[in-house]
Amino acid sequence: MTTGFLQKIFGSRNQRLVKQYQKTVAAINALEPQIEQLTDDQLRGKTGEFRQRVASGESLDKLLPEAFAVCREASKRVLKMRHFDVQLIGGMVLHYGKIGEMRTGEGKTLVATLPVYLNALSGRGVHVVTVNDYLAQRDAEWMARLYNFLGLSVGINLSQMDHAAKQEAYAADITYGTNNEFGFDYLRDNMVYETDARVQRALNFAVVDEVDSILIDEARTPLIISGQAEDHTELYVRMNALPPLLERQIGEEKADGTGVEKPGDYTLDEKGRQVFLTESGHEKAERLLSEWGLIGEGESLYAPQNITLMHHVYAALRAHTLFFKDQHYVVQNGEVVIVDEFTGRLMSGRRWSDGLHQAVEAKEHVKIQSENQTLASITFQNYFRMYAKLSGMTGTADTEAYEFNEIYGLETVVIPTNRPPKRIDKQDQIYKTAKERYDAVIRDIRDCYERGQPVLVGTTSIENSELLSHLLKQAGLPHEVLNAKQHAREAEIVAEAGRPKRITIATNMAGRGTDIVLGGNAEKQASFLELDETLPEDEKRRRIQKLHDEWQALHDQVKAAGGLHIIGTERHESRRIDNQLRGRAGRQGDPGSSRFYLSLEDPLLRIFAGDRVRAIMERLKMPEGEAIEAGIVSRSIESAQRKVEARNFDIRKQLLEYDDVSNDQRKVIYQQRNELLEANDITETIGAMRQSVIADIVHQFVPAGSIEEQWDVPELEEVLRNEWQLDLAIQEMINESNSISADEILEAVEAAADEAYEAKVELVGRESFSAFERSIMLQTLDRSWREHLAALDHLRQGIHLRGYAQKNPKQEYKREAFELFAAMLDAVKLEVTRVVMNVQIQSPEQLEQAAEQLEEQGSHLENVEFRHAEFAEAAAAAPVAAEAATAAMIGDAMSHGSSQAAAANMSADNVPKVGRNDPCPCGSGKKYKQCHGKIV
């Protein structure tokens, strides 16, 4: 109450910010008469002047009024569009690193030109991020005219572009591209073996279009670069026969044994999208798998030799019970293609992880692709937080303002509309069944059609859009369907959606990014005519003129009928998605209306609010076909949506806290890689590693500060001779000396190692040997990092169980992840030193050839995929198996004695049972607890 009272006096934070920006708007407007007097060349020359001032130390903030005034004037001359005052405010919001909420049709693309121009003056690059290639190319080509007029270069970063084209795109002052491509380029840049193979510059400033879609909806889907793993095709096919033989249990068993309405073999958690076998389900699955010869008779699924089968059992169950055709995926050209649950678009090239995609392929009887193994990954949360300055714009951000601030440190500012909105949002209507709901939707559509009012109907899945299309055909109502299956015609369908009597069905926000103009989009229709090569030029001009003449009459007709009417056939889990659908109507002060039609069979109502609403309907004795239309019900639904949003936010926050651990380690590894790539000579680095490794070996047998009786000199001599090619008579040194310390022995071994190293360098030359060392170092670091990623994933999968031991799983994860990381770095030092010390060199040419083969092996990975993965599933992506050394001499180096071969094959999964103080089975000579036991 006090807060509301104070807000009335002082205004909200949003109102105060807008008021503050309006003062700067007045300063920009005051400059307009002066800027208008400039010739085109003088206006263009302002860019050079601004750049000099920035180089001299003037801040971009101080330059803002002049730069915005110049950009606005250039837009008037080139694009024939003048920025409104509210668009100037939007530009300031973006420049100051905030998120701007702008209603649909308020000109977000034009707003972005202001901060993009201003920040490009620094010469450090600006990235404009969009959700798909079509929008990136459209906006870049449209706005390039403005930027080029002002003397700035524009690049487009698209998927499938070659390396040279990408480097050129990133070198431009302004780079347009998709969130996926920017993220993948970052990962690829950290897998290269030459500095000139990188494409990105330092991440300076990004303007993210549809920021809610990218930073929130896709925050749970990390970008993953992966290769193909072992083929389990036959196993997926055989497991596909299991789910149909199992029955679902209805109800959860309570502590007193009640609660189960119908016993079964598995239970479903629809909220968490998980499936769990019951006790009887385990027994039945084990019996069936035993009959099929997949496990031994009487064996448990949890026996060590069968534990991987559980992964296949659950993948098959999830594929059959939680993922459905034309809702979560479509089958197209013999492939299973994922449908984005937020946008309804097909996500070609993306695959679910953890074997789920292969299980769905087995279910649909299409060709099963191989499983994937992770080479590199990053979340959008951690990628975009690396920019020095980040901003974004969307039509619906205010509902997620807390998350933007909490996760990204971004403040949300609601930007006023240029004209007051006239859209009427009607009360939801709730029916008992889906059939009653669809009958009401058809009645509303028919009413609009007869009055000449265009209708946009939003559905939550392809399946529902096709069901509604079938019902409209039966009702004799002509319509267009806009879903992932009609992706190619999307722009054309949206351009026509505002014409009189036009009925358009769209899945969620398909067509987002393109305005629905009342009367139809004459400009868009004209552009289609321009592309028609069969028409003569005279005929084109005549038709385009006719289009413009007809448009005004159609526009007035639609306005008189009430503007665009939005019908929602189901509430989404997020209020923001519902608001996006509503936001398609009432653009730039046009009239419009919206209404949602719901049924108690909808997932959101059934899971979260069904019982309460059903009780209200039964109390009111609602007859069939009658709807509830009351504020209390709408509030109940909104409350359910808030619960889901809060739950999803908690999930994203938890995932980020876990991912931050691997992100900190990723930064260290990538920094080390970059230092290796950029260093002219890594002799000092290799020398420090060699000293560290030699010290560890000597201290195993001759501990520091110990007496001679505690030394194991014969074993030390043997290890140095067999594993490190150092033939030292240490026992003779001891016998000849009256008193020799452990430190003196260490110095003698280090001197011998340095001498052997220098002899190899002298044979081939410092430059050649340094190049070889760099290749070995990069290859080992990359391989170890991939294995470490898999180790972290396995750790994360079981870490929640620590809660049962009264331990904090997050703290335990951080502690153990750090220990794994330290062990990995030690393993890298050991491996690199071992190869360098053991390598047999005959000639410089042989060394160069080996280095080239190593680099080629690391940079040309076969069957590489660039994809998203559902985060919970991404954790199960397997590591890349250790690559075999490519050069013969490295093969020789790695085969000196059995211990090297054994060590190369030691991992947490195949270490035999051994006492902590026993010698490690890898043959290193260390105690198990100080060697591979440390990693396990």
From Swiss-Prot:
Required co-factors: Zn(2+)
PROSITE patterns given in the database record: SECA, SECA_MOTOR_DEAD
UniProt superkingdom: Bacteria
Location in the cell: Cell inner membrane; Cytoplasm
GO annotation, biological process: intracellular protein transmembrane transport; protein import; protein targeting; protein transport by the Sec complex
SUPFAM superfamilies tied to this protein: Helical scaffold and wing domains of SecA, P-loop containing nucleoside triphosphate hydrolases, Pre-protein crosslinking domain of SecA
Membrane protein topology class: Peripheral membrane protein
Binding site for ATP: 87, 105-109, 515
Physiological role: Part of the Sec protein translocase complex. Interacts with the SecYEG preprotein conducting channel. Has a central role in coupling the hydrolysis of ATP to the transfer of proteins into and across the cell membrane, serving both as a receptor for the preprotein-SecB complex and as an ATP-driven molecular motor driving the stepwise translocation of polypeptide chains across the membrane.
Matching PANTHER family: CHLOROPLAST PROTEIN-TRANSPORTING ATPASE, SECA INNER MEMBRANE COMPONENT OF SEC PROTEIN SECRETION SYSTEM
Protein name, as recorded: Protein translocase subunit SecA
Species annotation: Paraburkholderia xenovorans (strain LB400)
UniProt gene name: secA
